[in-house]
UniProtKB/Swiss-Prot annotation:
SUPFAM superfamilies in the cross-refs: GroEL apical domain-like (SSF52029), GroEL equatorial domain-like (SSF48592)
Originating organism: Synechococcus sp. (strain JA-3-3Ab)
Disulphide connectivity of cysteines: none
Protein name: Chaperonin GroEL 1
Main location: cytoplasm
Pfam family, one: Cpn60_TCP1
Length: 542
């Protein structure tokens, strides 16, 4: 395939066009008065969303050069979403602003490598300042505030997430499901989560979110390593006859056994997903027994005389729902094993009383928490399928933001933190050389962009709002919902520090890479041929 090569200004301009197209589509969603974006779907109804990363993932441009720029921007949103779970639109706006400002300076003769160093040093300084400004999350009120803002100013969602955290604790498991009714409800059920994800990405059922989700599934729980196909076939046949999905939890699944599960899943013969067993050594066996008791199954192990080929359906666990991501597995049960779970918890508590080891004590407490803590399930309801999808995305964002807030604290929201921190950059840049100072100025101007866009989406002149907020001190900012200037903490307009930090770091990283790009190599588009004619002049058949 022939390649197209562009250099210097021409290369950067082509990339910038792609960056701007993606960023312009994403940034209309920021703030309480942000708009929605409609995404066409090849199958089914179009999707109307307000979520930056979902929009970014959908954008594929026809021009390969512009598409490369759009992919760079998509990386900003995806990485921020992976780390913090929210703040993707802010990250996109910051990156676009840094790219535009940087390009102006490079065109005027600035050194790209010095700009990059200036951007990186200023970002490192700002990350320290964000941590210094963060306040720890205190009580239910703060949790509800963070969730409300992240869900697009929906106090009902904020209150529900606060209740869910009350029910299962701050480190507890909270999952989001689609409800059959119009109302959004919260219920606490028996369940467990452990830190192991799918062995192969071919097991995923939702390629957008990269998760495998099944309802009413069987669980094969074994301490053996599965590699031989012959051992597994009888079990797979029994489950396939029932027409229900299967979750395999084993020491490892490899070779023929893994290939068979993947092929059956892809062909639609048997919906299956395989994960490695949690923990190590004796603790692994104990955890597997915990999962077996929770799901009403048995641990299949040759140590206790049960061979894989002899496994019947009543030896297998049953889950109401399973959700497997690349690094976590969540099992939700119907609560029918409650008595057995309580008995198991009492047994672990006895072990806890007799142990002297601090490490063992910690691990036993962890097992009790996993077994007894349960799972809070937020069942999302809406009038239409389109509204349901959008609402579910908003609630997932709010949940991620709340967890991030518990982790690193909260800062004033609505773009106020970044704007106020820009005041410290003139003093900081005295430590940089003249060329690096230009990089610091690029970051300083970019910090105004999120608030500017929030005001713009609310139908106001962004630069006027930015000036008014700059006249005041932290934590003052602009409440776009009411159009007033307020104390952001007092008003409950807060962002998780982790979200603000991740957005800034990822935006700076991509902008710095872009500004030091001197050449692009992309595939040359094939010349269009006339319909029906082959490239060899129509002499294709003899």
């Amino acid at each position: 395939m022939a390649k197209q090569i562009l250099f210097r200004e021409e290369a950067r301009k082509a990339l910038e066009q792609g960056i701007n197209q993606l960023a312009d589509a994403v940034k209309v969603t920021i703030g309480p008065k942000g708009r929605n974006v409609l995404l066409e779907k090849k199958f089914g109804a179009p999707q109307i969303v307000n979520d930056g990363v979902t929009i970014a993932k959908e954008i594929e441009l026809a021009d390969p050069l512009e598409n490369t720029g759009a992919q760079l921007m998509r990386e900003v949103a995806t990485k921020t979403n992976d780390v913090a779970g929210d703040g993707t639109t802010t990250a996109t706006i910051l990156a676009q602003s840094m790219v535009q400002e940087g390009l102006k300076n490079i065109s005027a003769g600035a050194n790209p490598v010095a700009l990059r160093r200036g951007i990186e040093k200023t970002t490192a300084y700002l990350v320290e300042q964000i941590a210094a400004q963060a306040k720890p999350v205190e009580g239910r009120k703060n949790i509800a505030e963070v969730a409300t803002i992240s869900a697009g100013n929906d106090p009902e969602v904020g209150e529900m997430i606060a209740r869910a955290m009350d029910a299962v604790g701050r480190d507890g498991v909270i999952t989001v499901e689609e409800s059959k009714s119009l109302e959004t409800q919260l219920e606490v059920v028996e369940g467990m989560q452990f830190d192991r994800g799918y062995i192969s990405p071919y097991f995923v059922t939702d390629t957008e979110r990269m998760v495998a989700e099944y309802e009413n599934a069987y669980l094969l729980i074994t301490s053996n390593k599965l590699s031989n196909l012959q051992d597994l076939v009888p079990v797979l046949e029994r489950v396939a006859r029932e027409g229900r999905p299967l979750l395999v939890i084993a020491e490892d699944v490899e070779g023929e056994a893994l290939a068979t599960l993947v092929v059956n899943k892809l062909r639609g013969v048997l919906n299956a997903v395989a994960v490695k067993a949690p923990a190590f050594g004796d603790r692994r066996k104990a955890m597997l027994e915990d999962i077996a008791i929770l799901t009403g199954g048995q641990l299949i192990s040759e140590d206790i005389g049960i061979k894989l080929e002899n496994v019947t359906l009543d030896m297998m666990g049953v889950a109401r729902k399973i959700t497997v991501t690349k690094d976590k597995t969540t099992i939700v049960t119907d609560g029918s094993t409650k008595a057995a779970v309580e008995k198991r918890v009492a047994q672990i508590r006895k072990q806890l009383e007799t142990t002297d080891s601090e490490y063992d004590r910690e691990k036993l407490q962890e097992r009790i928490a996993k077994l007894a803590g349960g799972v809070a399930v937020i069942k999302v309801g809406a009038a239409t399928e389109t509204e349901l999808k959008d609402r579910k995305l908003r609630i997932e964002d709010a949940l991620n933001a709340t967890r991030a807030a518990v982790e690193e604290g909260i800062v004033p929201g609505g773009g106020a933190t970044l704007l106020h921190l820009s005041k410290g950059i003139p003093a900081f840049k005295a430590n940089l050389n003249a060329e690096e100072q230009v990089g610091a100025d690029i970051v300083c101007r970019a910090l105004q962009a999120p608030l500017y866009q929030i005001a713009h989406n609310a139908g106001l002149e962004g630069s006027v709002v930015v000036e008014k907020v700059l006249e005041k001190e932290m934590p003052f900012g602009f409440d776009a919902l009411t159009g007033t200037y307020v104390d952001m903490f007092a008003q409950g307009i807060v962002d998780p520090a982790k979200v603000v930090r991740s957005a800034l770091q990822n935006a700076a990283s991509i902008a710095a890479m872009y500004l030091t790009t001197e050449a692009i190599v992309v595939e040359k588009p094939e010349p269009k041929t006339k319909t029906g004619a082959s490239r060899s002049g129509g002499a294709g058949m003899m």
